[in-house]
Amino acid sequence: MTPISQRISQKSPKLRETKQIQMTTTDKSAGIVTDSEAGPETSLLLNPHEGSTKKAPSDSYHFAYIIYFTLGVGFLLPWNAFITAVDYFSYLYPSTAVDRIFAVIYMLVALVCLFVIVVFYAHKSLASFRINLGLLLFVIALLVVPVLDLVYVKGQVGLYAGFDVTSAAVALSGLGDALMQGGLIGVAGEMPERYMQAVVAGTAGSGVLVSLLRILTKAVYPQDPDGLRKSANLYFAVGIVVMVICAVFYNVAHKLPVIKFHEERKNEELIREKSEEKGSLTGLAWRTTLWDIVTKVKSHGFGIVLLYMVTLSIFPGYITEDVHSELLTDWYPILLIAAYNVFDLVGKCLTAVFMLEDEKIAVGGSIARLLFYPLFWGCLHGPMFLRTEIPVTILTCLLGLTNGYLTSVLMILAPKSVPLRHSETAGIVTVMFLVVGLASGSVIAWFWVI
């Protein structure tokens, strides 16, 4: 075992954000200090070589938090735009299972690219380069649909060459997701937990934004081909604007004192590692270290896979296809999806108030969510009172709330279970687990009906 591997196997570095009054504590059971205990920016850097203590500057006006939240909104918005416009694509290409094909393309490309990044490039490429490249690919992919619609499709049905180009744009978005999400989660993992919480909450914010747009377009535009076309173009236009905002925000973030502090902290760790190891990790040494990182976060990853397997096998397929309401008619699935997204956001924001610091309990919660299967089954086949709008709405809200909270907990804890210098890689590995969960849930949704 290499020296790096030995250090990863030793004491978990959960003390990296200890309160000032406990900064000399070395008790391994101290755990991660929450923002409510130590304040959002009281992280301390203990440099054994200098014998000095550096205190992180405050996040003035919460600019850094807002930036990371916005970036979280950004990397899921392209996928949300494609999948929300599926009604228009289904109209254009009636003999194609558009939503299923898009899901396979997007997730397969994202998963393969994440694997390549984590194995070959994560330890020797800059996260800033990957994030900016991902944003550029997102903008290009989002431009494809409205430009294609303007110059070629023009609302005509059956031009399947247009579907091929659109599918290529979905694949490009999957690549952009792997680059941006992997890099962003990795960078957030190197910082105090409030920034990972901001990113994760941003992903839920993306869902809420798209739900609001869907409600707006349904209320404003007629549900005919022209209305569907205008709605789709609006989704992609909003997506492009948000991508530009994300690009500006991310490249401005490095000028904030709090971001500079944590970047310098990471650089000091890297310099110390190279001096102790007499060089950078390459080849077999890196693969051994990577395996140790995977071992450290495997329980978190299992919980995340299970979370999204359950969620995606029920939502949105079951909610949009299997339940009906005479009262709410075609508004019913739209409102259920909005309810899920709102409570997913609430759950992901709750970790800013109360942070569960034991991953075993969080994984247990992920396992307990298997109970949603018989509960939703009861809403279809059980007693009549379970088949009404109220039980389905309550279960949908609980599905979103538990998904949001447990996702946030596991995503925050995973990078903190390894040394700081490996937090970025741990974050990327965790994203791989997340994509596996998404893919598993989508497959179950296709072949198994509640």
Curated annotation (Swiss-Prot):
In young seedlings, expressed in root elongation zone, root cortex, root-hair, at the transition to the shoot and cotyledons. Expressed in hydathodes of fully developed leaves and pollen. It is found in: Vacuole membrane. Induction: By nitrogen deficiency and 5-fluorouracil plus methotrexate. Keywords: Membrane, Transmembrane, Transmembrane helix, Transport, Vacuole. The keyword DNA damage does not apply. SUPFAM superfamilies: MFS general substrate transporter. GO terms for cellular component: mitochondrion; plant-type vacuole; vacuolar membrane. The chain crosses the membrane at residues 63-83, 101-121, 133-153, 168-188, 196-216, 234-254, 300-320, 334-354, 361-381, 394-414, 430-450. NCBIfam families: 2a57. Nucleoside transporter involved in adenosine transport and required for nucleotide metabolism which influences growth and pollen germination. Has high affinity for adenosine when expressed in a heterologous system (yeast). Plants over-expressing ENT1 have decreased leaf content of adenosine and show growth deficiencies. Plants silencing ENT1 have increased leaf content of adenosine and decreased rate of pollen germination. Belongs to the SLC29A/ENT transporter (TC 2.A.57) family. This is Equilibrative nucleotide transporter 1. The gene is ENT1.
